[in-house]
């Protein structure tokens, strides 16, 4: 009751029927007015690729996120501020560039083992299921980072099957659903995935400007959760929040083509894509972040 108004239009956080408004004393009204102003400010700073309804729901949810996290949301971050491993700062590479190294990647770059890498660092190399949402929330202005994945933790739970998608809700509070690769294959009558078909899937599923979480199974085994982002100039970019693949980094060569060439031919149902910049984070999983 009392939440049926539209704050983006009437500039009221609560309707006149809500007890806060109907029976508010002077101090309570001042608090409501302050929250209403914050809602309006957050809506104003959101990108144009969100609908007004999405902006309103996200703005209200941001207040809940602030309360649950115990921090105040800042201004939206740029891609550079949210990315470049800023979502996972404790990640440490097990192998480091070395012209004389004994190990070599697909690009011919040579590496040697990182002497500073310790067994305890491994948890920050298997925490992709929190790095992806951490990046999305950093874009909104939440200065949070990913925790490491340890046995029995909620990160461990999210690493299993379709569980990773449970962190996202639609703006009406219902569970958000991913577009599964297997479902897409069935609609195309494809029996298996190929690099060309992965590209087709990415382009079709990520056609609108926005931030998308991708769950992909590797040809070599195992899987990964990461980010595809469609920019307003039409570019579709692979952004890796777990370990930096931005321009100038040692992993710069890991791009959308790399994903297409590395994906499994016969993926599990849990693999797929979900647009997440227009979703609400499920605060039941808030403990997967450091702040």
What are these regions (language model features)?
Residues 42-52, 68-71, 174, 208:
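Surface-exposed polar/charged interaction patches
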Residues 64-171:
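Active-site nucleophile-adjacent alpha helix/oxyanion-hole segment immediately C-terminal to the catalytic cysteine
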Residues 39, 51-62, 154, 164, ...:
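Short amphipathic alpha-helical segments that mediate assembly, nucleic-acid/protein binding
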Residues 58, 68-89, 268-278, 284-289:
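Acidic, amphipathic alpha-helical interaction segments
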Residues 20, 28, 124, 129-132, ...:
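Stable alpha-helical elements in mature extracytoplasmic
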Residues 223-225, 229-291:
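Active-site signature of cysteine proteases
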Residues 2-55, 60:
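Metalloprotease/metallohydrolase-associated module, dominated by Zn2+-dependent proteases
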Residues 138-223, 227-241, 247-254:
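Conserved active-site-adjacent core of cysteine acyl-enzyme catalytic domains
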